[in-house]
Amino acid sequence: PVRLEKVRGEVRFDGVDFDYDSTPPGSSKGASKGTLRGIDLTVPAGGSLAVVGPTGSGKTTLSYLVPRLYDVTGGRLLIDGVDVRDLDFDSLARAVGVVSQETYLFHASVAENLRFAKPDATDEEIVAAAEAAQIHDHIASLPDGYDTLVGERGYRFSGGEKQRLAIARTILRDPPVLILDEATSALDTRTEQAVQEAIDSLSAGRTTITIAHRLSTVRDADQIVVLDGGRIAERGTHEELLAKDGRYAALVRRDAHLAPVVPAV
């Protein structure tokens, strides 16, 4: 296995296919949910990519391939030019951080839950990460602060709070590549704003791939890709895709429940 000492964070999908049941490409069997076909994409180090598309288009599957939760069934996925299948486990684990829709908290203190990401983190580092993730004030208001027990028999955090704890964990880990699978659950406006500010703190200076379920958060991405049936249907910036008036523009209209979108001149 290859050990990457210093990860810049370029991510490249080179003709990537993926099948949950490993149906050979080109077979007559219809594309199943989550199948990917012929994905060619490069996200430069420090760049941002947003992936959008209807349910079952393969968005979340795409995010699973970078940290090797699944392996590609065709083509290659490269980090800094190295196939992820050739990287040693430590290099890959240090290179890629994932903030998923599901955040698991252990029956332990808040501090221990955060320290899971970096066992040697100092108290100061934990507080700084929580502040960046917009969750410090809430933790500080709990009866035992960072020593408050959480989990099944302890304090129960809300969905938005859990998400910010996951972001704080990832800030502590400091990975060069970030995979962000947005929560589909509805958050109130204030919570959503806090979560978005936490995400902005986290993604600054990192290669960020966002699996977007709401389009309001993707317009600033360097590159937006629309997946449909496991293939790339459109790609470009927010403005370019609105001007095309294709699938992305239709998704934006549906998302905003607005009249036809007129791109800014």
Language model regions located:
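ABC-type nucleotide-binding domain
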Residues: 2-265
